[in-house]
Design a protein with these regions (language model features):
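Residue-level recognition of tetratricopeptide repeat
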Residues: 74, 90, 124, 158, ...
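TPR alpha-solenoid repeat register
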Residues: 76-78, 93, 127, 161, ...
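Short coil/linker segments at helix-helix boundaries
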Residues: 78-91, 171-216
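Short, small-residue-biased leader/transition segments that mark boundaries at the very start
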Residues: 2-9
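N-terminal leader/linker segments that initiate helical-solenoid repeat arrays
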Residues: 36-81, 87-92
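Short coil/turn linking the two alpha-helices of tandem helical-hairpin repeats
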Residues: 137-139, 166, 171-180, 241-244
Length: 244
């Protein structure tokens, strides 16, 4: 199911997400003076403007992140109206908003800002993975499919992309196989030609969808010892033997 696919993808990177969060909190503690904490979004954004004008990009990004937490609407408006989109810091600020909205589960806004970031860094794998996840959460599985395929062109062993594509093609194959079987069972006295057509249909499903699922899931096992991927590969192997 879609929910199972979503959970699978979430589980695959939750540890990395936790570590990134801890690193981020530690960095904020080191970079921000105590006076920053507890300020309003407008106060923080005023400091962001000052930091940007002084060329202190790292400090500006840190303040911008705090501003997003203090008031996301004001911070987003600041991004659209006060940030030079051609500057080096602009995509970093877009990424701050993308991550913030993702954490707030505002997937439409998160998707918007990941796309904004990717305009400047179209081959950034972590951003592409996050963008694909947002596409999936917004119900755009076909778009997520294309984005994950792009991820694998850049990083063939990417775990999340291989998990998603492996599960996607396996579930698609199961759906196609079920329809073939149901249609064949409706025939009360199948002829040899009808049986041959049925077997050819199964063979096509295996060669295409099951075959793709197998390739992606085998890659998953090369990177991560996933029990679920192993079980699915066993099912595919069993069907392969039945078709021979």
């Amino acid at each position: 199911s879609r929910r199972q696919r979503q959970m699978c993808i979430r589980d695959s990177y939750i540890y990395t997400l936790k570590m990134k969060t801890l690193t981020l909190l530690f960095s904020l503690f080191l970079m921000c003076p105590l006076s920053v904490w507890g300020q309003s979004a407008d106060e923080l954004l005023s400091k962001v403007s000052d930091a940007l004008s002084e060329g202190k990009d790292d400090y500006a990004v840190s303040l911008f992140r705090q501003a997003a937490n203090a008031g996301e609407d004001r911070t987003e408006m600041f991004y659209w109206t006060n940030v030079d989109k051609s500057s080096e810091v602009a995509p970093r600020l877009a990424d701050v908003l993308a991550v913030h909205y993702k954490e707030m589960r505002n997937y439409d806004k998160a998707y918007l800002f990941y796309k904004e970031f990717l305009q400047r860094h179209p081959e950034d794998v972590p951003a592409l993975v996050s963008c694909a996840e947002m596409e999936m959460m917004r119900g755009k599985e076909k778009d997520a499919l294309k984005t994950y395929e792009k991820v694998l062109m850049l990083d063939a062993d990417n775990l999340q992309a291989n998990i998603f594509l492996g599960n996607y093609y396996y579930l698609q194959a199961e759906k196609d196989k079920k329809k073939l079987e149901e249609d064949y069972k409706k025939i009360t006295s199948p002829t040899r030609m009808q049986y041959a057509r049925y077997r050819n249909g199964l063979s096509d499903v295996f060669t295409n969808s099951y075959g793709k699922a197998k390739a992606y899931l085998q890659r998953v096992l090369q990177v991560f010892p996933s029990m679920e991927a192993g079980n699915t590969l066993e099912k595919i192997k069993k069907m392969e033997l039945e078709l021979k």
